[in-house]
């Protein structure tokens, strides 16, 4: 105290200011570590953009809408915990899309709710089926071509096969898989009427297994299945019954992989007309004769008999490869998904791309797109998204992942030989179809932030929504051909119809927020 008294006023002020700065720094560190969300609340960058995300006005939907819902749950909580995902709870009817932004965001238009949800009697009239006549009208004109883009790949032109690009011919005793691989083209994995798809599926289901090897790398157990004539498939074994959902306390990056999700994703990709996922089929194996007796030594060491006298194994991997998370037969019969291998010849190598809307894969940190309202403008300026088809392919991928509920899209691959003007492969869907009563709106972030969708994709979604057959029925009919049918739990099928309506409502919101006269490339503050 005596020292303070002898100090000059100026020195006291300097010391006080220094102490205050130290205290503020400590408070900032505590805020970041404890995730209170104060530090970053006003730090959103304001960058240029090419299309307007919009403010709270929603053009007649009461200030709601998908974009507002996404912004409210993400962009205004930039420092929130990663476990607090943007969501819409189930409750939408499978036939009717939401007629307002609030209804779509809540998924509530009179359908089934999730387990434990109480039902109350209402005197309100049921919401009539919204056929999205406005979107159908916009399809007939170019007025909103900045949102609905006519960029469907023309498979009839400039579409060479891998065989033509690599100057390879099928060998004399070529398998169906080898011939399928050589017929892969620049714009799709297989043609709409390609009969080799069913032949490849049939081989994976019927051919005898010769050898089993655990696939190296990855977070969970996968097996490489080898058949005669150098045919290979990637097996994901069954862990849970169809109706078991994602554990509520699991992050997306620690979720279990589901074999049936791989099967369903292939069928959905084909129904959507993308044809960017390799054929996948279900099959039931005898663990003793078709895995244990054919496996290599490293995998054999992990086999054991459970207290229930079921034959089990767990392999070696990053997650869930131990005795408490073993794969078990019943007692030695095991179901799994079998995905056909992509080409492995040298010139057919693939390029790995980091997905621009990749998640942080961290318990607390958020990715840039989760905090920057103008993030799409940055992506649009970076090759290969600044030109060509790639950005539109990512919109398709977002639609596909939103329908399946897959949050685990961190990278994607393309064939090197075709350069940048080719399609991204749809691979690794094991974390889809886990939450039928929850619609993860953040998966749709590319579409919501860019306000962009392919015309051909929108046409498909409208066809599913308006009939004659909804997407759930088309999926059910397609999946019924698989040996392990029923592949999906009924609530997952119903979720497909509900999510179709949510996507359509999102495009409607985008159109209202981006009238033709507003597309001028000017900067707009969308974070307010």
From Swiss-Prot:
Residues annotated as the enzyme's active site: 408
Membrane-spanning segments: 13-33
Main location class: Golgi
Catalysed reaction equations from the record: L-seryl-[protein] + ATP = O-phospho-L-seryl-[protein] + ADP + H(+); L-threonyl-[protein] + ATP = O-phospho-L-threonyl-[protein] + ADP + H(+)
Signal peptide: none
Places the protein is found: Golgi apparatus membrane; Secreted
Chain's role: Golgi serine/threonine protein kinase that phosphorylates secretory pathway proteins within Ser-x-Glu/pSer motifs.
Protein family according to the UniProt entry: Belongs to the FAM20 family.
Protein name in the entry: Extracellular serine/threonine protein CG31145
């Amino acid at each position: 105290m005596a020292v303070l008294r002898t100090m000059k006023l100026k020195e006291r002020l300097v010391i006080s200011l220094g102490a205050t700065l130290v205290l503020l720094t400590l408070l900032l560190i505590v805020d970041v570590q404890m995730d209170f969300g104060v530090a970053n609340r006003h730090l959103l960058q304001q960058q240029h953009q090419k299309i307007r995300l919009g403010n709270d006005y929603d053009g007649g939907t009461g200030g709601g809408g998908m974009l507002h819902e996404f912004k409210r749950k993400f962009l205004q909580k930039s420092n929130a915990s990663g476990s607090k995902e943007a969501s819409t709870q189930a409750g939408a009817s499978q036939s009717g899309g939401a007629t307002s932004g609030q209804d779509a965001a809540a998924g509530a238009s009179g359908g089934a709710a999730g387990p434990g949800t109480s039902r109350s009697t209402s005197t309100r009239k049921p919401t009539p089926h919204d056929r999205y006549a406005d979107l159908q009208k916009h399809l007939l004109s170019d007025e909103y071509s900045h949102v609905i883009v006519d960029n469907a790949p023309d498979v009839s032109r400039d579409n060479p096969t891998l065989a033509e690009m690599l100057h390879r011919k099928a060998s004399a005793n070529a398998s169906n898989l080898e011939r399928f691989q050589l017929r892969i083209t620049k714009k799709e994995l297989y043609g709409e009427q390609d009969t080799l798809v069913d032949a490849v599926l049939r081989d994976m289901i019927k051919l005898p297994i010769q050898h089993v090897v655990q696939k190296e790398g990855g977070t969970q157990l996968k097996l490489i299945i080898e058949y005669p004539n150098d045919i290979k498939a990637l097996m994901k074994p069954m862990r849970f019954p169809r109706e078991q959902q994602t554990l509520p306390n699991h992050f997306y990056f620690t979720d279990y992989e589901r074999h049936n999700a791989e099967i369903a994703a292939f069928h959905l990709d084909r129904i959507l007309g993308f044809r960017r996922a390799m054929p996948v089929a279900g099959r039931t194996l005898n663990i003793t004769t078709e895995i244990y007796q054919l496996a290599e030594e490293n995998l054999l060491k992990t086999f054991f008999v459970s207290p229930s006298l079921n034959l089990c194994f767990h392999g070696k991997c990053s997650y869930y490869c131990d005795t408490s998370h073993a794969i078990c037969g019943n007692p030695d019969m095991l179901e799994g998904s079998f995905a056909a291998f992509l080409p492995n010849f040298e010139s057919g190598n693939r390029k790995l791309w980091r997905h621009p809307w990749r998640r942080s894969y961290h318990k607390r940190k958020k990715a840039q797109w989760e905090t920057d309202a103008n993030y799409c403008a940055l992506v649009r300026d970076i090759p290969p998204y600044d030109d060509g088809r790639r950005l539109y392919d990512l919109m398709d991928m977002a639609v596909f992942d939103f329908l399946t509920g897959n949050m685990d899209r961190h990278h994607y691959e393309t064939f090197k030989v075709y350069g940048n003007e080719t399609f991204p492969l749809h691979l690794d869907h094991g974390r889809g179809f886990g939450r039928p009563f929850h619609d993860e709106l953040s998966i749709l972030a590319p579409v919501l932030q860019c306000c962009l969708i392919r015309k051909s994709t929108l046409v498909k979604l409208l066809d599913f929504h308006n009939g004659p057959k909804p997407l759930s029925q088309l999926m059910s009919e397609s999946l019924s051909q698989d040996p392990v049918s029923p592949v999906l739990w009924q609530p997952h099928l119903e979720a497909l119809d509900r999510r179709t309506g949510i996507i359509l409502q999102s495009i409607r919101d985008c159109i209202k927020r981006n009238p033709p006269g507003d597309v001028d490339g000017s900067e707009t503050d969308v974070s307010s």
